UniProtKB/Swiss-Prot annotation:
Belongs to the AdoMet synthase family. Its EC number is 2.5.1.6. This is S-adenosylmethionine synthase. The keyword tRNA-binding does not apply. It holds the Pfam family S-AdoMet_synt_N. It catalyses: L-methionine + ATP + H2O = S-adenosyl-L-methionine + phosphate + diphosphate. It comes from Prochlorococcus marinus (strain MIT 9211).
């Protein structure tokens, strides 16, 4: 019998790094909505009273970037200086966007050694490695720790937007530690929530009283509703519940910490339960395999688990710039598969087209923003890119592919 504790974290949409991810993806959405062939690599930086967007864009779209940035910040909840120390109306917004390098554009536009197949003509936008993962711990086939951390972060933001707890401010983080026995989750060991709040709550002003009040409220309005439908429930007597462990969290958001696009890549994926290739997602158009191939790798892994060919699977893909076909494909099932890793890898090579052009076409990645009223990627930029039944993500829809695999290999 082997037992261990695994921990994952999430952050709310008001976290400085997540503000930047959402801004970068809002820019991407706006450009792709007007011009689906836009090439975008947009980074954002926020600090006290400042937002900078920079990077490379080649597009025929015309976008009011300054007003777009302000609208994102405002929707998150930074509507005035009292709402977390960052004001959408008065912060400086700087724009420094260049065009995509012609050397990179050439690699995408004309793949090396391409055939008459149109998908062979589109090369990867960069070299790199990407990982996808799935397991049978949750209905959405995600690891339980990151799934729970996202649930708590979403619920925390939800009650703030609804005004349930009027003292809540936009910045926040959640963390969940799960006890495993023989690789199966058996209990929730610890929950940590750090949430920004006003300096006073009702008639309370002492740090101890405020912390006690927040702790009681968050268990009632965040933890309980976020976990009510789970088989594995937190226990108020056995589960450690830590809230704002330093005592208070008044100064937060960009006033408390600078934020950058792409600094929450583990939050965006599997909470550390699987490996990560290092490439961030937000602000990148679908020709960037950091994003599109990571989505495809998740689709492959989830399809395998949904077909019950394995209980948990990690898929590694690698690419070279300007080359359409993956350089390598590797499947690791950790001994949980109905066949060997080598056989599973053969299944993937036979049944999944992992060329960038095919991935873009299968998931309609260039057209999703225009199909969804100008907003798609921005909604993936907070609370995870995977295991999101609320967003109707094409790389999460594996039923048909799973049926195909079941018919062929069961």
């Amino acid at each position: 019998m082997s037992q261990f504790v695994f921990t994952s974290e999430s952050v709310t949409e008001g976290h400085p790094d997540k503000i930047c991810d959402q801004i970068s993806d809002a820019v991407l959405d706006a450009l792709l909505t007007q011009d689906p062939h836009s090439r975008v690599a947009c980074e954002a930086v926020v600090n006290t009273g400042l937002c900078l967007i920079t990077g490379e864009v080649t597009s025929t779209a015309e976008v009011d970037f300054i007003n777009l940035v302000r609208s994102v910040i405002k929707e998150i909840g930074y509507k005035d200086a009292q709402a977390g120390g960052f004001d959408a109306n008065s912060c400086a917004v700087l724009v420094a966007l260049d065009k995509q390098s012609p050397d990179i554009a050439k690699g995408v536009d004309t793949a090396e050694d391409h055939t008459d197949d149109p998908f062979d003509k589109i090369g990867a936008g960069d070299q790199g490695i990407m990982f996808g993962y799935a397991c049978n711990e949750t209905p959405e086939l995600m690891p339980l720790p990151i799934s729970l951390a996202h649930r708590l972060a979403r619920q925390l933001a939800k009650i703030r937007h609804q005004g349930t707890l009027k003292y809540l401010l936009p910045d926040g983080k959640t963390q969940v530690s799960v006890i495993y026995e023989n690789n199966e989750p058996i209990a929730i060991d610890t929950i940590v929530i750090s949430t920004q709040h006003t300096s006073e709550i009702d008639d309370l002003s002492s740090e101890a009283d405020i912390r006690e009040r927040i702790t009681k409220d968050l268990w009632e309005y965040v933890v309980k509703p976020a976990t009510s439908d789970l088989k594995l429930q937190p226990n108020q007597e056995k589960t450690r519940f830590l809230v704002n462990p330093t005592g208070k969290f008044v100064v937060g958001g960009p006033q408390g910490d600078a934020g950058l696009t792409g600094r929450k890549i583990i939050v965006d994926t599997y909470g550390g339960y699987a490996r990560h290739g290092g490439g961030a997602f937000s602000g990148k158009d679908p020709t960037k395999v950091d994003r599109s191939a990571a989505y495809a790798a998740r689709f492959v892994a989830k399809s395998i688990v949904a077909a019950k060919l394995a209980k948990r699977v990690e898929v590694q893909l690698s690419y070279a710039i300007g080359v359409a076909n993956p350089v390598s494909i590797l499947v690791e099932a950790y001994g949980s598969g109905k066949m060997s890793n080598q056989e599973l890898t053969k299944v993937v090579k036979k049944h999944f087209d992992l060329r960038p052009g095919a991935i873009i076409e299968q998931f309609n990645l260039k057209n999703l923003p225009s199909k969804r009223s100008g907003r798609f990627y921005r909604d993936t930029a907070a609370y995870g890119h995977f295991g999101r039944p609320d967003l109707n993500l094409p790389w999460e829809k594996v039923d048909e592919k799973a049926k195909e695999l079941i018919a062929l290999h069961n």
